Amino acid sequence: MENEYDMKSIKEKGVDFEDLWFSSVSDEILDNPEDENGQPFTGLAYELYPNGQIIYFTKYKNGLAHGLTCEFYENGNKKSEKEYRYGQLHGISIIWFENGRKKSEQQYEHSILISEKNWDEEGNLLNKYEIDTDSPHFEILESRRETHINLGRE
C-alpha cells in the first residue's frame, strides 16, 4: 500500500523527535530541556527507522499532539492514522495490517472510544462495538464534552 504523504516534505518541515524533550511535570513535548527554558513544542515531529524511512510523524500544538499522527511499517506502508485534539484521541483512528488491509477502525471523542470495528487479515469482520449510553465511559465523555466547551475548545 503506497502512502500519500510527502516524506521529503515531512523531513524538511519537521523536527526529529530525538531533538525534542519531555516535560517532567506534564505530558508536554518541549523544544529544549526544562533547565534551558524549554517551551511547549508546536510543529511537526517525526522519528526514523535506521533505513531512513519514517516510523511516524505527529503534529503538536503547545506541547500536545494536535492533528494528524501517522505510523508506518519499515517497508513504508501505512500502519496507523489517528487524529488528536489537545493531546486526546479525537476522530477516526485506523490501523492497517502490513499487507495493507484494514485491521481496525475506531471513533474517539476526547479519548473515549465511541465505536470500533476489527477485521482479520483476509478482511472478514471480527467484531463491532458501540458505546452504551448507560456505561461509566459515557458519563466520562459527557464530563469531558462539558470541560472542552467551558475551555472554549468546542
Swiss-Prot record:
Q: How does it assemble?
A: Probably interacts with cognate toxin YwqJ but not with other non-cognate LXG toxins. The interaction inhibits the toxic activity of YwqJ.
* GO MF, one annotated term: toxin activity
Cellular component, GO, one term: cytoplasm
| Organism expressing this protein natively | Bacillus subtilis (strain 168)
Please state, per the UniProt record, what induces or represses the expression of this protein.
Expressed on rich and minimal solid media likely in early stationary phase; dependent on DegSU. Not expressed in liquid LB, but only under conditions that promote biofilm formation.
> Can you say what this protein is called?
Immunity protein YwqK
Q: Where in the cell is it found?
A: Cytoplasm
The free-text function statement in the UniProt record for this protein reads: Immunity component of one of 6 LXG toxin-immunity modules in this strain. They promote kin selection, mediate competition in biofilms, and drive spatial segregation of different strains, indicating that LXG toxins may help avoid warfare between strains in biofilms. Mediates intercellular competition during biofilm formation; disruption of the operon disadvantages the bacteria, but overexpression of the cognate immunity protein restores growth in competition with wild-type. In situ neutralizes the toxic effect of cognate toxin YqcG.
- Claim: Magnesium is one of the keywords in the record: no
> Where would you say this protein principally sits, based on its record?
cytoplasm
